[in-house]
Swiss-Prot record:
Belongs to the NrdR family. This is Transcriptional repressor NrdR. The lineage of its organism: Bacteria, Pseudomonadati, Pseudomonadota, Alphaproteobacteria, Acetobacterales. Negatively regulates transcription of bacterial ribonucleotide reductase nrd genes and operons by binding to NrdR-boxes. The gene is nrdR. A zinc finger (unnamed) spans 3-34. It comes from Gluconacetobacter diazotrophicus (strain ATCC 49037 / DSM 5601 / CCUG 37298 / CIP 103539 / LMG 7603 / PAl5). Residues 49-139 form the ATP-cone domain. One of its GO terms (molecular function) is DNA binding. Binds 1 zinc ion. GO terms for biological process: negative regulation of DNA-templated transcription. Residues 7-21 have a biased composition (Basic and acidic residues).
Amino acid sequence: MRCPFCGHEDTQVKDSRPHEDGAAIRRRRICAACSQRFTTIERVQLRDLYVVKADDRRVPFERDKLARSVRIALRKRPVDEERIERIVNGLVRQLEASGETDIPSRDIGKLVMGTLREVDIVAYIRFASVHWDFRETKDFAAILQSIPGTADGDVPVVPGDAAAAIAAESGPGGVKRR
């Protein structure tokens, strides 16, 4: 494997361990030329997957892009990095197990939304707002209506403590609650 620091092709594996519940192998390597140490992670790839975009373009599936999207949706939420990796691994396994090599992007989005809905409802709404390209507040209202316990004013648009804090910051009038 090529050294990411100097580009030399001769690196040695110093340590290998199971990673991500055995779904991958973590290897510590050292470069023979510059002596820098680095880590690689190897995963099994059952088949090459392709994403079919809305305009019918076919692009290679990128696990890192999926992971980045999930991380963005879960940013500042109470979900640790290890759980995010398990979520992404599970999503990739489901895609590979589907038996399809060409997967529509909308199907990947639905799969991610279904998983995020079970993990964190805020992350689900964040992801859905990008996936479905929300343009107006009514788009958010519609998705909130689909969530049990949020219909017909059961839950304020801004939860109580947050609404009070925002009202205190915004001065007279504050934030109107639904």
